[in-house]
Amino acid sequence: RRETPVTDNRQIDNCGRCHARRGTLGDYHYGADLLDTHRLSFLQPPLYHADGQIRDEVYVYGSFVQSRMHQAGVVCSNCHEPHSNALRAPGNGVCAQCHKPAAYDSTAHHHHAPGPGSQCVDCHMPATTYMGVDDRRDHSMRIPRPDLSLVLGTPNACTDCHSDRDDTWALNTLRDWGIDADDTASHPARVLERLRSGDRRVAGGVSAQVADTDLPALWRATALETLGNSGAGQVLEAARPLLGSATPLLRLAAVRSLAAVPLEQRFGLLRPLLADPVLAVRMEVAASLAGVPPERLRDSDREALERLFSEYLAIQGEHADMPSVQLQLGLFHSARGDRPAAEAAYREALRLNAQLVPAHLNLADLLRAGGREDEARALLEQARRIAPDSGDVLYALGLSAIRAGDSEKALTFLAGAAEREGRSVRHRYVHAVALHDLGDPRGAVRALRALNREAPGNPEVLLALANYSAELGMLEAAAGYAKTLVSIDPRRTDWRRLRDRLAAAAR
């Protein structure tokens, strides 16, 4: 057992170039940071479960760097012979290199007879089977948490094996063994999932995760990205310190999280990273600042930004045969105001993969913005034939129908999008707004109430409920929604004025 943790990440980064869910940026260079040659996927659905367990085919890196073993300095070659990939010892002997067999390789610890269930990997590294034949173990090496399964729908090793039992049985069995989690409500995964569902009341808790140096860097990066995606006002405060982090992954997440910050302010924040030493960070900065008007910059900044854009286009050009890269180029050119180049990139993405729904949606939006509504609508109908159950496609068709003045068709499309939406609330919220605006305010309030019960703490939903309830004369309910709204961000003076006005009217 190592007395002091290894702080050199070169071995794990070398393995991660193949054993990670990633995109390629450049050629391999020994000793270079992984992010200097690859773009990593964060711990977001649908790639990972809400608690960070593997879900899609994400390989090993993303799960392993979450583990306590990684934080303690364990590296790949401690368990695997790097050339043959054979384990260092058979069975539980791999774990016994560090963990005392008398304490852990015993029925007193694992509560199973010798055989299935008594192997360390059975409980701490459950396998997921891909393509029907490829069993891959989750390398986050975690303790089974049926309590989280009950609230998050995440898997656990107990019911993965005992498929005839449920999570409540597993939870009670662990309690009978004296194992009882006391952090179900406050667990980082639970808090983060609430924010993913639109509950901004937990934004402060997610900000605390971002700042918590005891959490794995990949989890902190994921938390910061989620905070940015949520539109929470705390993102700037959370991201600013990490723009100068010594950990490239955290700098990358900080850049990504600022996408909704006004462009001029964003440039001021990201200006020191125009020449960041790590390529993935520079690529993220380039994409984030693509919309900066060069004529507003001083000469030195404009030249630095143009160099960065040239590098971005050169790197992307090396992978131009990938539809995802063409999609990114479309977004980049669109942000720069170059519609012909953006259209060409989106059409090339569709030539490479005619099933790529995001390219259909982005191209349709570009055509609409250019006054080509009929072409945009035809493209969306084509996307619907490809993906008839896509909520995003139905949502876009609903908005197109509203612009065309066809309220009946718009409500049909938006209702379909709302029915198909997962953890997000956007489609259901817009459907409710459409109900209100097209003459059914009571239906809108019913839809918003149901949404607020399922995903409480969303400011847009609460604001609409406050206003629509007041319109219908339900002043006490409206005042309650406004009060909850203010509790999410007391700094918002417009929300405070609304609360005070509705509270006075309800008296």
Language model features with spans:
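Helix-start (N-cap) detector for alpha-helical repeat units in TPR-like alpha-solenoids
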Residues: 248-251, 279, 323-324, 357-358, ...
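Structural marker of alpha-solenoid helical repeat scaffolds
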Residues: 230, 245, 261, 276, ...
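Amphipathic alpha-helical scaffolding segments comprising HEAT/armadillo-like alpha-solenoid repeats
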Residues: 200-210, 232-244, 262-273, 296-313, ...
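Primarily the internal scaffold of c-type cytochrome electron-transfer domains
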Residues: 1-215, 225, 277
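Register position in tetratricopeptide repeats
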Residues: 260, 291, 335, 369-370, ...
